[in-house]
């Protein structure tokens, strides 16, 4: 989900990042839909190497489509998944790798959000079901009354009718789309079949390698994709010009695409803003979101040109800082800062503060996923000076929104009332119209039910204010009710009738206890509380008045006045720790499976005033097992997705963990306009307490249930006669289309055309998907059945696949060998962006930085003394390839190899000793000595001519992976290492794999110093 509004914000600010998808129309033959595209034909959208499918983004709309009837069975839902996935594949047509990633167990930081969504979903479903039941009963009652039938009593007939409604099959529970459920097991089996079916029937798939990471593999789908991309970049034979595409709906995929630092990257998604204009069941159109063009916009928008700025502009690190700034506006793991909202222009405000900070700072805020906390503190300190102004503006905007909604609702209610009066032939006097307060309580003796409150809250609270007379009457009757000793009615609308107390903020607190209080309850007699008549939302904090910090923590965190100062710093430190966790998650993978932010609300920007010296450390931890996550995120109403042995723990009153499964819970609008944005105030789970009771039930599980609770690795499926299979035969894993070796085989990207990693025959217990025959696994009607394939005709083969583990920390840089295309933005468009920046800041710019003719002068200004100088061709800021020869032969632009490397000479977290580069202390550079990647002298594995040709030239020519003296050149980012000395190819990959490998796997003098 990420940042609501981010896609719209970027598509409006950077319009060229969005482009239409060319999609061939399908045809109907004998009632069957035939794709109009030929997968083997050239792709009209441009050729693509690797496609990554975040499968949850496909499964959800296929199982419970918006505005349409859901398929009647799970098996037919999976057929819809096949159909939709094929549509995506025919648009993208990847030629090398397809990765299908399903959400596995998530980090604890994400589980809290999943828990809130699933509890809210179950509650809404229950309310909807109750509303439907009552509506049908009411209709039946009217029918019987009008028919005047005799025989059974009206009460008896209605009881029988109600029982029939209760016994009707319920709506499919979308909470089944969670790891560990029978549905997810069925989904994985179905995808394995479908991939095998396509390999057997689609000629264009013959050389495609398909990696499936199902729900038994830990991690969120999009982050498993990120791990895969990082692992391939780390392979020494990786092609830096590989093109990538992710299909998915979440806005945070934009951040993930940027964080790869793979410029040939785009996203495929549905055009959600055009879908309402499509009639009936027409397919929603696809659009591309082009990350490479977004990088062009960011290059112009983020460039700092203040004359006091001494830091060289580096697009890659500027992008990382921009991603960091956006985390305060929203992400999947932390609540956004109160003053940060995309729709209010918060990203622009933060960027301006960042540019101002660059005049004071010595470096960027982030470095390869690590945060400079002192500079982060300085940034937020200056942002805090604008916080109150932004919050007041948000409040004014919300009030205007409420007024417009009130007018709209009043008109709609008046229309409904008029229609009802005509139908019933009755006249309703205003004096007899029941009036309700915002809690749903009648001023008289009528009390709304929970269902009526939630289902009709807008109609009730807004229609009562349809005209001034009604409003006056409401105020009078509310006051009269208060005077007679009735319970104070002017409390904000809430979803429960008997609210529970918010639990302790500690992540390992004791189980929560009940508390009759509720956030933001309002008292009309309190002059210090503002109550909005249209929604009943009580503004206790009142950001427009002084002292709002204390009120914020006292009302949102239930702190006492003398506790506020310590609490706000505690919350700020935990929040910043969370931001660091998220950044590391994006750039290096999950740093802790157990950490989570233990509060429902974010701190204020002014509270980050003592974070510069805080320690950010995460202890080792392991992911939950699937049933442990299910017990953490599912409400009791969805307990049918779990084995029967666990269900009493969720529903029985004497369960030791029953407090984790409340049926009623608080919703806090927290100043938001729409109810779906409300904060869901659920108790945080004590992991040790939960796991103690869940794991005690493991001995009662059946073998099938235990199997669903097992964690596994990815698999790769490929064609028996394709190029990948031929590579496996050359390496001895296969013979004549049959797997003959049980030993793991390590493969690099070059020999497999883009799929580095370790493959091996699956364990016997896990080999159901790799049997020679391929059987259609779904139970559907005959006309929907797909073919099965006997062993002698099945061309699909399956191996266990292990993603390579990086031996070094991922770096935020373009890889050597990348050839940038011509700019998409014209000179005029780039100038317009710069003019917009000048107008926003009112400052002067060095026009030399934007010269479109003197590229050499521009590069000298941007690159001198920075690690960009060592990347040469990989620079996005360079002219088209035909004009780049001047850089190769210019020793000045090659950089000061002794002193100018990547963060050398005491930069961010560095040690000055010995010119060692990023966090290195000796001369050896990044993890290596003089001998290249993990080698002392011999290179990647040969004694011959070198992967790049020419004896001793190494992988990239010159003397190593990055040319010159290493990955970054000289003593910097590579020191004499990561490509230095003899280079990634050293004596040469081409000289015979494994031949003359002299260096072993230890490296030389440098050593890995983190």
From Swiss-Prot:
Q: What domain of life is recorded for the organism?
A: Eukaryota
What Gene3D superfamilies does its record include?
Answer: 1.25.40.1050, 3.40.50.12390
Q: Which residues cross the membrane?
A: none
The annotated regions of Basic residues compositional bias extend over: 998-1010
Span of the signal peptide: none
Q: Which GO terms describe its cellular component?
A: Las1 complex; nucleus; RNA polymerase II termination complex
Indicate the enzyme's highest-level EC class.
hydrolase
Polar residues biased stretches: 504-530
Q: Does the keyword Acetylation apply?
A: no
Where is it chiefly localized? nucleus
Basic and acidic residues compositional bias: what residue ranges?
488-503
Region: Disordered; residue ranges are: 402-437, 481-530, 754-781, 879-923, 990-1010
User: Which keywords fit this entry according to its UniProt record?
Assistant: Exonuclease, Hydrolase, mRNA processing, Nuclease, Nucleus, rRNA processing, Transcription, Transcription regulation, Transcription termination
Got any disulfides in this one, which pairs?
A: none
Against CDD domains, the record matches this protein to:
PIN_XRN1-2-like
- Tell me a Gene Ontology molecular-function term this record carries: rRNA binding
Query: Which compartments does it reside in?
Result: Nucleus
Name the EC number(s): 3.1.13.-
GO terms in the biological process aspect are: cleavage in ITS2 between 5.8S rRNA and LSU-rRNA of tricistronic rRNA transcript (SSU-rRNA, 5.8S rRNA, LSU-rRNA); mRNA splicing, via spliceosome; NAD-cap decapping; negative regulation of transcription elongation by RNA polymerase II; nuclear mRNA surveillance; nuclear polyadenylation-dependent rRNA catabolic process; nuclear-transcribed mRNA catabolic process; positive regulation of termination of RNA polymerase II transcription
Subunit structure comment from the entry: Interacts with RAI1; the interaction is direct, stabilizes RAT1 protein structure and may stimulate its exoribonuclease activity. The interaction also stimulates RAI1 pyrophosphohydrolase activity, probably by recruiting it to mRNA substrates.
Function comment: Possesses 5'->3' exoribonuclease activity. Required for the processing of nuclear mRNA and rRNA precursors. May promote the termination of transcription by RNA polymerase II. Essential for vegetative cell growth and chromosome segregation.
Q: Which family, according to the similarity comment?
A: Belongs to the 5'-3' exonuclease family. XRN2/RAT1 subfamily.
Name assigned to this protein: 5'-3' exoribonuclease 2
Species:
Yarrowia lipolytica (strain CLIB 122 / E 150) (Yeast)
């Amino acid at each position: 989900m990420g940042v609501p509004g981010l896609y719209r914000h970027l598509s409006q600010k950077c319009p060229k990042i969005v482009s239409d998808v060319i999609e061939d129309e399908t045809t109907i033959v004998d009632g069957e839909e035939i794709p109009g595209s030929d997968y083997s034909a050239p792709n009209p959208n441009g050729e693509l190497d690797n496609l990554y499918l975040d499968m949850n983004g496909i499964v959800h709309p296929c199982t419970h489509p918006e505005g349409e009837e859901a398929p009647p069975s799970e098996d037919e839902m999976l057929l819809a998944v096949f159909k939709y996935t094929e549509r995506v594949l025919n648009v993208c047509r990847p030629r090398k790798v397809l990765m299908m990633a399903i959400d596995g167990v998530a980090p604890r930081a994400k589980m809290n959000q999943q828990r809130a969504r699933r509890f809210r979903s179950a509650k809404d479903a229950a309310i909807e079901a109750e509303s439907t039941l009552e509506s049908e009963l009411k209709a039946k009652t009217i029918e019987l009354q009008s028919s005047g039938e005799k025989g059974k009593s009206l009460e008896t007939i209605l009881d029988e009718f109600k029982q029939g409604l209760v016994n009707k099959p319920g709506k499919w529970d979308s909470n089944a789309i969670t790891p560990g459920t029978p549905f997810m097991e069925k989904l994985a089996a179905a995808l394995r079949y479908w991939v095998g079916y396509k390999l057997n029937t689609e000629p264009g798939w013959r050389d495609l390698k398909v990696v499936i990471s199902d729900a038994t593999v830990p991690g969120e789908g999009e982050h498993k994709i990120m791990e895969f991309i990082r692992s391939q970049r780390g392979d020494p034979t990786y092609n830096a010009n590989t093109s990538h595409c992710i299909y998915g709906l979440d806005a945070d995929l934009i951040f993930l695409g940027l964080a790869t630092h793979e410029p040939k990257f785009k996203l495929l998604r549905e055009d959600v803003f055009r879908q309402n204009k499509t009639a009936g069941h027409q397919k929603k159109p696809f659009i591309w979101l082009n990350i490479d063009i977004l990088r062009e916009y960011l290059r112009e928008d983020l460039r700092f040109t203040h004359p006091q700025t001494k830091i060289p502009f580096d697009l890659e690190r500027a992008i990382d800082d921009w991603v960091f700034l956006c985390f305060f506006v929203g992400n999947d793991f932390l609540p956004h800062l109160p003053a940060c909202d995309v729709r209010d222009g918060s990203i622009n405000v933060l960027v301006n503060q960042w540019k101002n900070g660059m005049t004071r700072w010595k470096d960027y805020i982030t470095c390869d996923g690590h945060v400079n906390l002192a500079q982060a503190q300085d940034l937020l300190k200056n942002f805090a000076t604008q916080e109150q102004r932004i919050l007041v503006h948000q409040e004014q905007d919300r009030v205007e929104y409420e007024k417009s909604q009130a007018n709209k609702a009043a008109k709609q209610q008046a229309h409904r009332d008029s229609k009802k009066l005509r139908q019933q032939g009755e006249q309703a006097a205003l004096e007899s119209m029941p009036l309700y307060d915002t809690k749903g309580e009648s001023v008289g003796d009528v009390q709304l039910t929970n269902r009526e409150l939630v289902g009709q809250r807008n109609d009730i609270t807004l229609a009562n204010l349809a005209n001034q007379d009604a409003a006056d009457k409401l105020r009078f009757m509310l006051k009269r009710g208060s005077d007679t000793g009735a319970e104070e009615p002017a409390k904000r609308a809430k979803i429960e009738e008997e609210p529970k107390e918010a639990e302790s903020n500690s992540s390992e607190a004791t189980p929560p206890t009940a508390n009759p209080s509720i956030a933001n309850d309002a008292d009309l007699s309190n002059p210090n509380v503002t109550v909005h008549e249209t929604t009943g939302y009580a503004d206790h904090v009142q950001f427009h008045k002084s002292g709002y910090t204390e009120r914020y923590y006292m009302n949102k965190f239930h702190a006492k006045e003398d506790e506020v100062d310590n609490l706000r710093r505690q919350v700020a430190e935990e929040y910043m720790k969370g931001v660091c966790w998220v950044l590391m998650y994006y750039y290096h993978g999950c740093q802790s499976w157990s950490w989570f932010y233990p509060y429902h609300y974010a701190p204020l920007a002014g509270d980050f005033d003592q974070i510069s010296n805080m320690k950010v450390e995460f202890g080792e931890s392991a992911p939950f097992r699937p049933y442990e996550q299910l017990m953490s995120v599912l409400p009791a109403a969805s307990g049918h997705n779990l084995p029967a042995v666990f269900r009493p723990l969720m529903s029985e009153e004497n369960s030791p963990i029953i407090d984790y499964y409340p049926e009623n819970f608080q919703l806090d609008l927290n100043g938001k306009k729409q109810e779906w944005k409300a904060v869901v105030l659920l108790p945080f789970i004590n992991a040790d307490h939960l796991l103690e009771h869940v794991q005690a039930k493991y001995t009662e599980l059946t073998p099938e249930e235990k199997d669903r609770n097992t964690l596994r690795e990815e698999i790769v499926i490929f064609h028996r006669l394709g190029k990948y299979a031929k590579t496996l035969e050359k390496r001895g894993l296969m013979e004549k289309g049959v797997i003959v070796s049980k030993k793991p085989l390590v493969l690099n990207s070059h020999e497999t055309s883009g799929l580095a990693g370790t493959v091996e025959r699956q364990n016997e217990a896990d080999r159901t998907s790799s049997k020679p025959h391929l059987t259609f696994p779904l139970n559907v009607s005959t006309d929907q059945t797909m073919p099965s394939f006997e062993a002698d005709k099945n061309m699909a083969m399956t191996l266990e696949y292990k993603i390579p583990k990086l031996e070094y920390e991922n770096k935020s840089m373009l890889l050597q060998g990348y050839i940038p295309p011509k700019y998409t933005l014209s000179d005029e468009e780039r100038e317009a962006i710069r003019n917009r920046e000048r107008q926003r800041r009112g400052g002067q710019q060095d026009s030399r930085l934007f010269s479109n003719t003197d590229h050499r002068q521009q590069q000298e200004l941007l690159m001198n003394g920075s690690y960009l100088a060592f990347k040469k061709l990989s620079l996005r800021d360079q002219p088209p390839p035909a004009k780049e020869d001047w850089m190769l032969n210019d020793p000045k632009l090659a950089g000061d190899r002794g002193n100018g490397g990547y963060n050398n000479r005491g930069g961010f977290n560095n040690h000055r000793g010995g010119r060692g580069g990023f966090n290195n202390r000796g001369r050896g550079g990044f993890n290596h000595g003089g001998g290249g990647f993990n080698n002392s002298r011999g290179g990647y594995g040969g004694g011959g001519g070198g992967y790049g040709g020419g004896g001793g030239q190494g992988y990239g020519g010159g003397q190593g992976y990055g040319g010159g003296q290493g990955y970054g050149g000289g003593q910097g980012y590579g020191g004499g290492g990561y490509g230095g000395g003899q280079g990634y190819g050293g004596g040469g990959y081409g000289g015979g794999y494994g031949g003359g490998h002299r260096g072993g796997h230890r490296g030389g003098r440098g050593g890995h110093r983190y």
